[in-house]
Every structure is written in C-alpha cells, then in structure tokens.
Amino acid sequence: MEPSPTRAAPAVPPWLPAGAALAAAGWGANQFTPLAAVYRTQEQWHPVLVAVLFTAYLPGLLPGLLLGGPAADRFGRRRVVRAALLLSAAASALPAAAASSPAAVCAGRLATGVAAGYALSAGNRWLRELCAAAGRSGAAERRAAYATGAGLAGGALAAGMLAEWLPAPTALPCLVHAALALLVLAATGRAPETTGGTAGAPLRLGGWCRRTVGHPRFVWVVLPASPAVFGAATVAYVVLPPLVADEVPGYAPLFSGVVAALTLSVGVVAQPLAVRLHHARTARATLVGMVTVIGGLLVGALAAYGDSVALVLVAAVLLGAGYGLTLGSGLLEIARLAPPSALPSTAFLHQGAAYSGFLTPLLLAVTAGAAPYPALLTGMAVVGLLCLWVTARFSRGNPP
C-alpha cells in the first residue's frame, strides 16, 4: 500500500497578506512624521498648521476603529481590509498630487485615518482567525503587533530617507506608499476569507457594560494612564526632533524618521514586558510604564533646553518604552475587566482615551508662545506625576 502523499505547505503563509495589510496601514499612518520637517523648512508652514495636519488623522481613525470590526462581521474581513487598502493608497496619492496645498494634505491625513482604522480593526480579526485556522492561535497577537509596529516604524524611516535623499520630498514618499498599498491589495486578493459576512444585517457595535466602564479600576487606573500611550510616542517623534533641527542641518527629515522608528521599535519590544510585569492585584505594569514616560518627558525637557541630539535619542528610548508598557498594560486591564460581549466597545473607549495623546503636539504648539518647550515638557511630567499618584492610590483598593 502506497503512503498517501503529504500536502505541500503553501508558498506564502495564509496570514502573511493580512499582516502585510496591517503593515501597509501603519506605514501610511506614520509617513507624515518626517514629511512634517519638509513642510516646516521648505514649504515654510507654521508649526501650528503642521500640528493641525498631524492631528487631522485622529478624527478619521476613531470612527474607523469603531466601525471596522462590525463592518468586517457584516461584509467579511478580506473585503473590508481590501477597501481600506484602496482608500489608503488614494489618501497618499492626494497630497502627492497637491503637495503644496494644506487642504489636500489635511484631506489626505483624514482619509488615511479612516483607512488605518478600518484596516487595523478588520485586519487584526482577520489575522487572528487565519492563525487559528493554521493551528497557531498563540502567535496571532504577536504577529499582529510586529506587523503593525513594523509598518509604523518602517514607514517613518523610509519616508525620512526618501525625503532626505531623493527629489520631490513631499510627493515621492507618498507615491511609494500608494504603490505599496496597491501591491498588498493585489496580494490579499488570493488570501482566504475567514467569514462570509452577513449581508443585509445591520452593523452592530456591541453593547456597553456599565459595570465595566464604571468600575473604579477602569476609571482610576486605566483611564488616567491611557493618554500617556500616544502622548509619550508623539512627544518623542513629533515634538522633540524639530527642537534640535538646527543641530542636524540638512538632515531634519531623516533625523525625524530615525527618532520615530527608534521610538516605535522600542515600544514593540516593550509591550511583551507588560505581560511579565502585570499582576492580578496591582497595576505594576501600568505604574512602571507611567514612571518611564515621566522620565522620558524630563529627559526631553533637558534635550530641548540644551539643544542636545543625544538626549533626544535617550528620551525617544524612554518614551518608546513607556508607550509600549502603558499600551500593553491597558489592554491587559481591559481584557480582565470587560465581559466578552462588551470587550469591543470597552476596548474602543480605552483606545479613544489612548489616542487622545495625539493631541499633545497641537496643544504644545498652541501654548509654545506662553512658555518655552522645556517648561511645557516639565509641566507635562508634573501632570504625569499626579496621574501616577491617582493610579497608584486606587490600584490596590480596587481589584478587578
């Protein structure tokens, strides 16, 4: 009796196109960071305008995160992810076609946020289910985090290099991302769908659990730490590099991309550490993350005061670690507090609080006329100490 032939492993793992979609979404979301240096120096745009354009991503991102999961349930994971990739490509093509128009850049940032929200929400579900179908459920979260982190860090670094060394610094990086998104769109065409969707069914956002969102641990532990997630990251790679741009003459876009890549790479590495630090009866991981963020803010204040490139890099490492720890610990807290039926909506509330940190560069740019940046960053550290005290005070007395 002849042995039955073994089935050959697929040349491309089924989860890889979904991971590539997450990376492409992250790339598009963060390519603006080094381009902001070009807008400030070559286009002579006011720092407040550049901060507004950076923040324009947020009003598109949050609805995308909220609706992406329900849309994927209704229409299918692959269809929603592919539509998001197409929108992401168009969102990059728009500012490339009208790079000197703030309105076009703003519209592109807004559309990029929508595309990223849908791609991240639906793409994470798709990747998890593809990994589960291959018997690798335990690897899903790690693969999703690495794919998204690689896109965020790689997009900033690549855009910085393209803007630094090649012509058309405000257009070429956007066109490269648009081409990448279309390539990933083609790759996802043959990836397996994990759910057929429920055509005709209304979008269901999931119920709110009052017991969860009103729980003292959510109110006094999770929420006070949440703005530090992206507040830390954006201070590191949006606020600090321009403050020392005169110390790297001619290399501002590249330096901005390097700092962004460093910050986000450290954040990806730090997220698993939150699992090790996490404790069922304390908020140890959250507290360590907040202390790290406060330290990063103080080092950033010193960097701004002394125009020190080296201290900006040190601050980026600390703020990146704080970003990763506070993000990871917040997700762990949400997973413990929320019942499965309310997990998506509770996670969205946490995400909304975390993404409020994206407003930090705009708030600092607006208030920079009233106080110098070293004082503003020190003030942020003081606010962080207050939040740290609140979180530490209520963490032991309010176990989940």
Which residues does each PLM region occupy?
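Symmetry-related core transmembrane helices of the 12-TM Major Facilitator Superfamily/SLC fold
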Residues: 171-188, 375-395
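Transmembrane alpha-helices of Major Facilitator/SLC transporters
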Residues: 256-279, 289-296
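A late C-terminal transmembrane helix in Major Facilitator Superfamily
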Residues: 323, 329-381
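Helix-loop-helix hairpin linking two adjacent transmembrane segments in secondary transporters
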Residues: 136-189
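Conserved MFS/SLC helix-loop-helix module at the cytosolic interface between two early adjacent transmembrane helices
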Residues: 62-100
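Cytoplasmic helix-loop-helix junction between adjacent transmembrane helices
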Residues: 108-148
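C-terminal transmembrane helical hairpin of 12-TM major facilitator-type secondary transporters
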Residues: 283-328
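Structural signature of the two symmetry-related core transmembrane helices
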Residues: 79-94, 284-300, 378, 382
